[in-house]
Structures are given as C-alpha cells and as structure tokens.
Amino acid sequence: MRPLYFEPFNNQKPNNWTISTLGNISIMSAGGDKPQNVSQTKTNLCQYPIYSNSLSKEGLYGFTDKPKISEESVTVSARGTIGYVCLRHIPYVPIVRLITLVPKTEAISAKYLYLWLKQLHIVGTGTTQQQLTVPGFQKTKILVPSQEIVTLFTTMVAPLFQKIWSNQIENRKLSSLRNMLLPKLMSGELDVSDLDL
C-alpha cells in the first residue's frame, strides 16, 4: 500500500479510521465457467450481463438469464492484464478469473472501494503469465474511514456515477443508431440531399 498522507487532519490518521484488508471489508470470489444460457445480445430471456477478464467493453462477454451477483460491487481483472477495476451496479455474472468484491456495507461502500482500488498499483504473481489470486488479494490493505464519512462520501459521489451511467446508455443508443443509418446513407437508400444543413 502506498504511503498515506493526512494533511487535512494535522498529518495524523483520525482515531475512528482504521487500516483493514480487502478480505475483512468485502466478500471476494473469482469468476468461474460461463453459464449454459448465453446470448451475444441482450434479449427478453437473457438480460443480465456476463463479464470476463477482457478490457474491451469493460469485459462484456454476453448476456444470460440469471445473475450470480446482485449487489453493487467491484470487479478486478486477475489474469493477463492485472488490475483493471470496474464498478458494477446492475446484477451480473463474472466468469474466467474475474475477481469480484462485494463490500460489507457496514464497513464500506462499493463506490469508495472502487475509487480506492483505482488508485492502487495492483500486481499479480507468476513469471510466465501474471495472475491475481483471491487469497493473495484479500491481504491487500485499505484505509477505512468512519461510517459517517463513508456515507457522506458515497452520497456526494453517487450523482456523478449516475451521470456517467446515463451517458454510457445514451452513447450505446447513439452508436446503435449510427450503425443502422450509416449503411443506408452509403447505399443511397436514405436520401439526405434535400436537407438544409
């Protein structure tokens, strides 16, 4: 854990803040095999995202019919590119060595945990292929403020995350619209010559 500086607190850690471990403040698990029901696109049956160790599309692998994780949580890539951290706010299924941390909410929030992990330099073990293991990662230290401060912090950052998620949904809709319209424009099926631009 990198050195902590407490300038706003006269360079001292507040008495009611503690240094704990990820194993103490979260329920940690590693993703397993992909589910039996998998769809490449979201359907009425398969509405829950499946996330893998990949970096593209935040690890989105596909969709399935039953979530494994329902709580707001954090995932960390555990093989290959180690330490890619994502905040997950909708129910999902983690697969293929993706580590999931479900925070114990009496200690910490998922948003605080996510932002704490984002600023860490997370390293794995192994010479041929780097990997992060649950037992090893559970020992990682984390600063835990008082419950009052965690609640206040989470309340302050929640609207920012809501805005990010809303923008992501809007971007996906616009990308889908572009992909539908562009071939029609290029083929001449859709005529825009009369538009006054």
Regions found by a protein language model. Give the residues of each.
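Short histidine-centered catalytic/ligand-binding loop motif
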Residues: 98-102, 153, 163
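Aromatic-residue hotspot detector
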Residues: 92, 152-153
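DNA target-recognition domains and sequence-specific DNA-contacting regions of bacterial/archaeal
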Residues: 18-145, 196
